[in-house]
Amino acid sequence: MNLSKGDKVIQLSFHGESSGHALVSKLSREYNIDISIIYGNIEMLDGKPLGKLVTIFSGSHNDIEKALASIGENNVKAEVMYDAQ
């Protein structure tokens, strides 16, 4: 994996209805960032979808921070796994 300065590796955790939203494309459009998906998995738990995506967020520091702040509003958990400062 080749990261540029400022890129962040982010794990997104989805559950229930949040797994059906087009979050990645929405964040990319609204915050002018590129999001690359490097891993994804979805399972059913008690009949409800539960999933994880490992992504790379690329763009300006401010745009990435704004995108991360908005993720919680979509009932999705974001964890910064690596920050290529």
Task: Please state what every model-predicted region is.
Residues 1-52, 56-85:
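Long, contiguous binding/interaction regions
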